[in-house]
Curated annotation (Swiss-Prot):
There is a cross-link at residues 119, 164 (Glycyl lysine isopeptide (Lys-Gly) (interchain with G-Cter in SUMO2)). One of its GO terms (biological process) is cytoplasmic translation. Component of the large ribosomal subunit. The ribosome is a large ribonucleoprotein complex responsible for the synthesis of proteins in the cell. The modification Phosphoserine is found at residue 130. This is Large ribosomal subunit protein eL18. Its main location: cytoplasm. Component of the large ribosomal subunit. Changing residue 51 to S: In DBA18; uncertain significance. The gene is RPL18. Keywords: Cytoplasm, Diamond-Blackfan anemia, Disease variant, Endoplasmic reticulum, Isopeptide bond, Phosphoprotein, Ribonucleoprotein, Ribosomal protein, Ubl conjugation. Belongs to the eukaryotic ribosomal protein eL18 family. GO terms for cellular component: cytoplasm; cytosol; cytosolic large ribosomal subunit; cytosolic ribosome; endoplasmic reticulum; focal adhesion; membrane; nucleolus. It comes from Homo sapiens (Human). It is linked to Diamond-Blackfan anemia 18: A form of Diamond-Blackfan anemia, a congenital non-regenerative hypoplastic anemia that usually presents early in infancy. Diamond-Blackfan anemia is characterized by a moderate to severe macrocytic anemia, erythroblastopenia, and an increased risk of malignancy. 30 to 40% of Diamond-Blackfan anemia patients present with short stature and congenital anomalies, the most frequent being craniofacial (Pierre-Robin syndrome and cleft palate), thumb and urogenital anomalies. DBA18 inheritance is autosomal dominant. Residues 161-171, 178-188 have a biased composition (Basic residues).
Length: 188
């Protein structure tokens, strides 16, 4: 009698479409599905894959980070492409002239980019502008930037751990004695 094949782990876990029911996002997916199929550029495949992603995997990109990345050598006169949101950064004093394509741009970031003489494209305009992704720079925000990542890692309280504990309150009596000071048992 043969051993049956174990089928419980042979499902490939990856998105084939966005979870969102947003009709405008679905239209973009239709467009980039076509482009990914009909053009031989990896750019369109990457954009399509990122359109499927969950919101936590499409973190917002700040204006300052985008400016820093676009100042790198060889990136002059290129379009910054962000499959996500571009947010304003008040720490930036002057914004250079930028050409940007994003799913969303917050109102303050939008006004600052346009005031600097920049241009903001949507993804359907980008598809007409550069269908193969020529002259573009794909950027994304920091995925590990969310506060929740501070709680991940080595258990808090163990040596050399910088993991943030989940604490009810940040008061004097909460996780401040044993393991935090030498007079109370030990100090890590």
């Amino acid at each position: 009698m043969g051993v049956d094949i174990r089928h419980n782990k042979d499902r490939k876990v990856r998105r084939k479409e966005p979870k969102s029911q947003d009709i405008y996002l679905r239209l973009l997916v239709k467009l980039y599905r076509f482009l990914a199929r009909r053009t031989n550029s990896t750019f369109n495949q990457v954009v399509l894959k990122r359109l499927f992603m969950s919101r936590t995997n499409r973190p917002p990109l700040s204006l300052s980070r985008m400016i820093r990345k676009m100042k790198l050598p060889g990136r002059e006169n290129k379009t910054a492409v962000v499959v996500g949101t571009i947010t304003d950064d008040v720490r930036v004093q002057e914004v250079p002239k930028l050409k940007v394509c994003a799913l969303r741009v917050t109102s303050r970031a939008r006004s600052r980019i346009l005031r600097a003489g920049g241009k903001i494209l949507t993804f359907d305009q980008l598809a007409l502008d550069s269908p193969k992704g020529c002259g573009t720079v794909l950027l994304s925000g920091p995925r590990k930037g969310r506060e929740v990542y501070r709680h991940f890692g080595k258990a808090p309280g163990t040596p050399h751990s910088h993991t943030k504990p989940y604490v009810r309150s940040k008061g004097r009596k909460f996780e401040r004695a044993r393991g935090r000071r030498a007079s109370r048992g030990y100090k890590n």
